[in-house]
Amino acid sequence: MKIEAVVFDWAGTTVDYGCFAPLEVFMKIFHKRGVEITAEEARKPMGLLKIDHIRVLTEMPRISNEWKHVFGQLPTEEDIHEMYEEFEEILFAILPYYATPIDGVKEVVSSLRERGIKIGSTTGYTREMMDIVAKEAEIQGYKPDFLVTPNDVPAGRPYPWMCYKNAMELCVYPMNHMIKIGDTVSDMKEGRNAGMWTVGVILGSSELGLTEEEVENMDPLELREKIEVVRNRFIENGAHFTIETMQELENVIEHIEKQELIIS
């Protein structure tokens, strides 16, 4: 078994430690309408196409009930599109500041390329958003061989289409010769649905939701508990492997190749 390509997620996996760029924007657009949502609620759908993310938030029972209390009715598609337009406007302005590669990513990608492994990527951001993020990340030294956004395929995560398009453009087949790595539940489902080896990265992830400073200063036992919660969540949603940092990815690749594992 030879791993020929790795498909990385972006925010929370390769850039934007903790995936904070969209978080406060989601909270802000609801707050503006008198509906308060928590950071935990805002993170739950992370990884989806952003308009789908907003739609899922409006469908959460507590949020939909609070919306109904404020407006006397449940959110409509018009409300969702209106919030999405505001979301885009705010996010576009801040995205350049959230495109810094996470520590270790550039070195791991360079090492993978030395092994002949191709580098693909998928995202929950739109093409317009990624034009900003990818440009800034490239300036800072990170550029995958290929990028697919939900705009390029019939549907985003958890559907496998973005991974399939990466496979076609990178000329890799069968799908079990590829790894999908990400930091959200939707990443795990995307990779599994595509028939790929699926890896969840924990530190820096949206699922963990901590800044680098918080990780460094947290009580080790408390941090370990939080890490294990995320690890279990990834496994429950299809991850074949979990890693705490990107530097562990090559160990996973060697394990798959040496053990000649078969996707179950």
UniProtKB/Swiss-Prot annotation:
Domain of life: Bacteria
Entries under InterPro entries matching the protein: HAD-like_hydrolase_sf, HAD-like_sf, HAD-SF_hydro_IA, HAD_sf, PGP-like_dom2, Phosphonoacetald_hydro
EC class of the enzyme, as a word: hydrolase
Stored Pfam families: Hydrolase
Cellular component GO terms, alphabetical: cytosol
Keyword terms, alphabetized: Hydrolase, Magnesium, Metal-binding, Schiff base
Protein EC: 3.11.1.1
Catalytic residues of the enzyme: D9 (nucleophile), K50 (schiff-base intermediate with substrate)
Cofactor: Mg(2+)
Catalytic activity from the UniProt record: phosphonoacetaldehyde + H2O = acetaldehyde + phosphate + H(+)
Residue sites binding Mg(2+) per the record: D9, A11, D183
Cofactor details (free text): Binds 1 Mg(2+) ion per subunit.
Entry-linked PANTHER family: PHOSPHOGLYCOLATE PHOSPHATASE (PTHR43434), PHOSPHONOACETALDEHYDE HYDROLASE (PTHR43434:SF19)
Family classification: Belongs to the HAD-like hydrolase superfamily. PhnX family.
Known role: Involved in phosphonate degradation.
Oligomeric form and interacting partners: Homodimer.
Protein name (record): Phosphonoacetaldehyde hydrolase
Species the sequence originates in: Bacillus mycoides (strain KBAB4)
